[in-house]
Amino acid sequence: MAAKKQSKSAKALRTTVRYEDVAVSFTQEEWEYLTSTQKTLYQKVMSETFKNLTFVESKKKPQEPNPNLKDKDDDKSSTCTGVFKGGPFFFCLTCGKCFKKNTFLFNHQFPVRSRRLAVTKPQSRKALGHKPQHRGDRPFFCNLCGKTYRDASGLSRHRRAHVGYRPRSCPECGKCFRDQSEVNRHLKVHQNKKPVAGSHVKVHQNKPVASNQKQKGRVPPTTRESPAPALRHLKVIQGPVARAKARSSRASSLEVRSTSVTVARPREKVYCPYCRITFTMRTCLLNHLKIHFRRQPNQHFCCKESHSSNTLRMQKIYNCPVCDSSFRGKESLLNHLCSRRPIRLSKCWEILGHLLGYLREPLGNIFKVRESRKRRRKRISSDSSETEGPSGSDEVMEVDTDSDLS
């Protein structure tokens, strides 16, 4: 009996101690209740325990070598870099887990693969079974599209896309942007542009020009007094032999078409009887109706049921949250938000700005400002017409008096 007890005690001593047995783990709710000093103390204690475990593992006795597993041991020794020598640990401040490398902590906080699967394959098991870690890191979300952000500045910048608010403008071309970073990115386009050559042609009479190096220039524009050249838009090549090249008749015909005034005909909008999406062309409506005919009548209209990328692209819809009008493109939705309708006095983006709390002025003040501006314009136009009227009548009276005297 004593021998059996000794064998049991020896087995109990030989059992390995894991990190999970020694470590103390807190739940998310318990971790939130801890103070900053308690969190730092917990990190220090856990780092010390981890170092002690690695030290004990390095001091273990080596096992007896097995001749059958020599090759495998050699491969392991070549791949293994050694025992962790102890260094700075990386702790997650939200759940308290520690990691050896910063990359492990980053993958723990921001799992990239699950996000890609959720976008590319939304019905896959990995994407459906995945639960996003640390939701508290992105508490700010948009009520319209559901996008989440870490801080309020990112959410306000995203709201400008819905409202169409672009306060920053380019000093070179006058284009408007949402923030200064987009303006700085746009200014690089102006910096990379090469300076346009002048209209005059520089002729180097003294310097000889090689046959392989040809300098190109343009003929100076003609004035009213100077005679016009025989060919339009000559392209002169300076060198040992001067040649003139005229552009083809096709290019000139294209110029005439571009300069001619085109009258835009109003197109009748056609809407889908199933989902009430409006289209300007009937062919687009017919292509859209194929999606409804493919599916069964009891199924709902959803992007998940389509099988190809073209059908997904056609089913992508942008809805206006104010007037419930749907569009296929993002630009058309922004144009609709910024345009003013004759039925409504205000634009859709103004109403949306008040709903989101972006514009602080009430709609009544905006209407008053518009009415005052209209009245001022009417007064200015009436004053200008009155000033022009009496001057014209005086001239007529003077002409009549001159005719009477004659």
Curated annotation (Swiss-Prot):
Single GO term (MF): DNA binding
A cellular component annotation (GO) from this entry: nucleus
InterPro entries recorded: KRAB, KRAB_dom_sf, Znf_C2H2-type, Znf_C2H2_sf, Znf_C2H2_type
Signal peptide feature range: none
Locations listed in the record: Nucleus
Tissue: Expressed in oligodendrocytes and at lower levels in astrocytes.
Site residues, Crucial for 5-methylcytosine recognition: 178
Record PROSITE patterns: KRAB, ZINC_FINGER_C2H2_1, ZINC_FINGER_C2H2_2
Any Pfam family: KRAB
Disordered: annotated span: 57-77, 194-226, 372-406
UniProt-listed Gene3D superfamilies: 6.10.140.140, Classic Zinc Finger
Domain of life: Eukaryota
Transmembrane among keywords: no
Zinc finger residue ranges, C2H2-type: 90-113, 140-162, 168-190, 270-292, 318-337
Keywords, alphabetical: Developmental protein, DNA-binding, Metal-binding, Nucleus, Repeat, Repressor, Transcription, Transcription regulation, Zinc, Zinc-finger
UniProt keyword annotation of DNA-binding present: yes
Biased composition (Acidic residues): 395-406
PANTHER family in the record: RIKEN CDNA 6720489N17 GENE-RELATED, ZNF44 PROTEIN
Swiss-Prot/TrEMBL domain comment: The KRAB domain is required for function as transcriptional repressor. Zinc fingers 2 and 3 mediate recognition of the target element, ZF2 interacting with the 5' half (TGC) and ZF3 interacting with the 3' half (CGC).
Family the entry assigns: Belongs to the krueppel C2H2-type zinc-finger protein family.
Functional note: Transcription regulator required to maintain maternal and paternal gene imprinting, a process by which gene expression is restricted in a parent of origin-specific manner by epigenetic modification of genomic DNA and chromatin, including DNA methylation. Acts by controlling DNA methylation during the earliest multicellular stages of development at multiple imprinting control regions (ICRs). Acts together with ZNF445. Required for the establishment of maternal methylation imprints at SNRPN locus. Acts as a transcriptional repressor in Schwann cells.
Protein name per UniProt: Zinc finger protein 57
